[in-house]
């Protein structure tokens, strides 16, 4: 699409004035996604060439946004959020692995943008995290394979700039793990608390998905991973938030309570270095 190409050139050369491009950015990318969308009931029939160009344009815009403009112009944040909302369909449901990777290439750009860590962080995270958790869940790839891939994530050089057309589920899982790792690794205490709360909401079945507490191994594994991958200085937030959820959530099922207690046991048994963990308060 010619208009998409022109927008990419503008974004590539734009050093400032992103606020003036926000409306055009939103309108062009949302229109391009509507053109690329499946015409029938089959969600795997996206025009992924157009979608890839949308994801590239999205990443260009959000990564080049000056932090000073982000703090003073809500319109930019709104435009970024609206386009991301439209892109969500590329990463959820019965789509192809290539479609998931295209979606993640856009999200990767967002996570390296100053807009991601503003006060809009809860909105952005609640949008992208359920899809990422779907991809690393046992419904996509068996837990033993995902757990093995997670052991190599910090050294994984996988790039989302060139999306392969024949990607297998394990490749997509690697990409999702890397995104989760990057987000956790750069989270401060406030953002980490929001991350834990959103993960619990996913496990509770509050994200238009069924509850995941029945899966003993995966629910424990994903919560323990939050501790393992978060910065040592703020990872104390994870067990404290879990205990708070355990004691303050009304009408919680016995299964949920059991899983949270099991998770605490796993965290403490592993003797992970947790700076600032007050065992008296925790108990």
Protein language model regions, located:
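Structural marker for long, regular alpha helices in very large eukaryotic proteins
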Residues: 1-9, 13-283
């Amino acid at each position: 699409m010619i208009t998409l190409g022109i927008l990419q050139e503008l974004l590539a050369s734009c050093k400032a004035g992103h606020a003036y491009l926000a409306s055009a950015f939103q309108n062009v990318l949302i229109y391009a996604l509507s053109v690329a969308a499946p015409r029938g009931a089959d969600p795997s029939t996206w025009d992924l060439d157009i979608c890839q160009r949308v994801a590239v344009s999205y990443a260009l815009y959000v990564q080049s946004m000056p932090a000073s403009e982000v703090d003073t112009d809500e319109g930019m944040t709104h435009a970024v959020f609206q386009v991301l909302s439209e892109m969500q369909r590329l990463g959820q449901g019965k789509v192809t692995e290539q479609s998931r990777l295209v979606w993640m290439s856009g999200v990767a750009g967002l996570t390296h943008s100053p807009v991601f860590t503003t006060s809009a962080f809860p909105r952005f995270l609640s949008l992208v995290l359920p899809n990422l958790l779907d991809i690393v869940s046992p419904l996509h790839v068996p837990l033993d394979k995902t757990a093995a891939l997670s052991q190599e994530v910090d050294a994984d050089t996988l790039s989302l700039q060139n999306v392969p057309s024949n990607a297998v589920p394990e490749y997509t899982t690697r990409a999702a793990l890397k995104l989760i790792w990057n987000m956790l690794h750069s989270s401060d205490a406030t953002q980490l608390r929001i991350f834990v709360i959103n993960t619990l909401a996913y496990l509770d079945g509050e994200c238009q998905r069924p509850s995941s507490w029945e899966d003993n191994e995966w629910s424990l594994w994903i919560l323990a991973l939050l501790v393992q991958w978060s910065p040592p200085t703020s990872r104390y937030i994870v067990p404290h938030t879990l205990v708070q959820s355990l004691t303050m959530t009304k009408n919680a099922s016995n299964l949920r309570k059991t899983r949270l207690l099991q998770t605490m046991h796993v965290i403490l048994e592993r003797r992970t270095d947790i700076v600032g963990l007050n065992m008296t308060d925790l108990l």
